[in-house]
Amino acid sequence: MRIEHHSRLTQSAARRVVLGLCLVWTLFQIYTASAIPFVLSDWFGLNIVFNNQEVRQIHLAFAMALAMLIHPLRAADHSSIPWVDWIAATIAAGCCLYLLVFKDQISGRSGLPVTADLWVSGIGLLMLGLALFRALGLPLLVVSSIFLLYVFFGDQPFLPDSMQWKGASLNKALWHFWMQTEGVFGVALGVASSMIFLFVLFGALLERAGAGLYFIQLAYSLLGHMRGGPAKAAVVASGLSGIYSGSSIANVVSTGTFTIPLMKQTGFTAEKAGAVEVAASTNGQLTPPVMGAAAFLIAEFTGVSYTDLIRHALLPALVSYIGLMYIVHLEAVKLGLQGMPRSSRALPWLQRYTSLLAGFFGVALLGGLIHLSFGWIKGVAPEFSIWLGLLVFVALYVFTLLLASRHPDVETLDSPESFQTVMPAHEILPRGLHFLVPIAVLLWCILIERLSPTLSAFWGTLAILTVILTQSALKQWFRGHAFQWALLRRGWDQAISGMIQGAQNMVGIGVATAVAGIIIGTVSLTGAHQVIGELVEALSGGSLIAMLVLVALMSLILGMGLPTTANYIVVSSLMAPVIVSLGAQSGLFVPLVAVHLFVFYFGILADDTPPVGLAAFAASAISQGDPIRTGIQGFTYDIRTAILPFLFIFNTELLLIDVTWVKGVTIFVVAAAAMMLFAAATQGFWLTRLRLWETGALLVIAFTLVRPGYWIDQIQPPWLPQSINETVLTEPTYAGTLQLVFEGPDFDDIDRDVRYVVLTTIPEGTDVTTFLESQGLIVQVDAETVSLEEPFPGTNYFQDLQRFDFYGDRPVALTALSVRN
């Protein structure tokens, strides 16, 4: 039994234990996400409700134990589990459960660990490192080890003065990282245990049900006959798989097995075929709602709601896929490629588009009726709303399954050889419409009912489990055969297998998020992000663009070899504060979600960046091409994705922040056109091969479309400088937006001046100085200067202005003031 990539084949007795642990872990996570604990507590009066911290401890106990049992430390142990691994699994789980068993005693001695606490913490960290090495290899282990070394040796004289900190004792560090919630058992692990697990489980169950194969078939039926059809199908299939997939590598393996051989067959080289799949699968990690399981972490770290995050991330992901689709088209045109032959004559175009529009409006009308019905039921009899939801789900599922029963099963086309001709989309579409019902349940709960991601994933998981259990038996029954209980038992086996697979997929993520807690804990303990910020500031020379480029390069380097969730945690912990801090000094004020998406995009692009690019290695194994050349080609395709973060840093409307739906549609059309022009410029081809000046012209036009304000700013500056004294003193009731620049001695080095820019809007009819004081900006005006006093704790700018030394010989002064033009 192959448990997962790089895992071991176990003997039968051990196999049952490992699979049993996986199943128990999944059932535990479903149990804690549901209302079952509260119902059972009410019925039987038992305290069987687990709080968030207890769930994290049990979650990591399962993850570490399974990492020891599934992944061999030596190649010789690939077919069995030695007794040493059983002991390691027991010790690892015990170190986590120690916190659960002795929680009352530990809380009573907060900050004063006993010897047992220190031993458990030390051994637990060692076991966590071993589990990480087994599950994910060296990259994240090396990164986290460097951070741990910095905690213990950050006060040593061999480090530059700017990097030194006071250091931590062994007792303090062990308590910080293991015994409280700022280290291993912190926010990252909490998000993994409460949200990510259920979404990974949902994806595993969808794949087990056959949805992945259905998406590939559907994309191929729609696009396979076009120029470069298999490559275009790979882009769409990877985008659809990205809805639920938590790994770009898994995406490459699942869709690339079918699409890469077909791309080679139509004329793509091995490297280009692999690169298209890599670029498409990498972009799948940027696609809402899951975003490689990092969406929940981004929402948690930025403080935006999960629904808002989906809205912010949707347009860049769509624009990026449109750009990739156009790149594939241009490659096919340049190479003179054709599509795959159709299996039968296509329907007339008018009939195709009429059917498409009818289907779209039919679904929209049905969704509207369901929404109105729910609203009416909730107002009249809210206790019946759940029964209405169940009725709607059953009706939709039965109807779509009835349609599927009139066509061959999805599994009849399950090999690359079966894709030699393109079947009509109207024959493929009905075969798997029932797979869309659980996805609709998930999205309905999140976007319409505004349930929490955890509860939404719970209902979506129940829906897909229902599909797996019943689809085969019901389809045969709808086809006129007798009801076959054997098919129901097969559905049960598939459901169990899917739940086990979901737990197996979570092992690496669970361990990675725990280790990422060490990095977050180091940053909170040492202020390491400030050190990196000073380094970036020194290297960039104060240039905003240079700073963003450096942060992008560092995010690429830090993201190499890491899974999506750990990737995001590492780059966001270190790089996001740098953009916020240095951007504020330069007058760039960007919403926090835009900053986190910036570093997330570049962290994900590391998957196809040589020399580590893991997704490129996975694709080259299928295409039989060179992995380095595949990675380089994939990165050239992904240049358009690398440009997007820079665009939405300077133009946050691309993230649909504070825009109407009409403006949102306009932004989408303009951004898509700009991305296609940029793709044509990078490919050197648009209708025909481009001359150098034509390439430059396309780049300028594309830039102008997404950043029109840049050229306007060159003619009419966005800010008008004002006389400091006159503005503050003679116009006390000025209404509008002010940009204030403060300069003063650095708190850490009084011989050096630092700068901070404040952007604030003065309400109409408000005294300027009074309003500034309410924000914590207390200014003192004398004959020549306007100085700033230290803000009071708790005011808006208290934390940001701690960079200044307010009690030195030189004051912190207001050196420039501008009003918005």
List where the protein language model places each region.
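Long, contiguous bundles of hydrophobic transmembrane helices that form the permeation core
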Residues: M1-A13, C22, R311-Q504, F617-Q722
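Low-complexity, proline/glycine-enriched hydrophobic segments characteristic of transmembrane helices
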Residues: V363-I386, Q585-L588, Y710-N821
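Hydrophobic mid-bilayer segments of alpha-helices in multi-pass membrane transport proteins
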Residues: V18-C22, E54-L69, V84-A93, V120-M127, ...
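Hydrophobic transmembrane alpha-helices
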Residues: F202-L205, L240-S241, T282-T287, A512, ...
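Conserved, well-structured core domains of diverse proteins
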Residues: M1-G108, L118-G122, G323, A702, ...
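Core transmembrane alpha-helical segments of multi-pass membrane transporters/permeases
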Residues: L130, R134-A135, S145-F147, G154-P160, ...
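Membrane-interfacial loop-to-helix junctions in multi-pass transporters
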Residues: T115-W119, E182-M195, L222-A234, T266-K272, ...
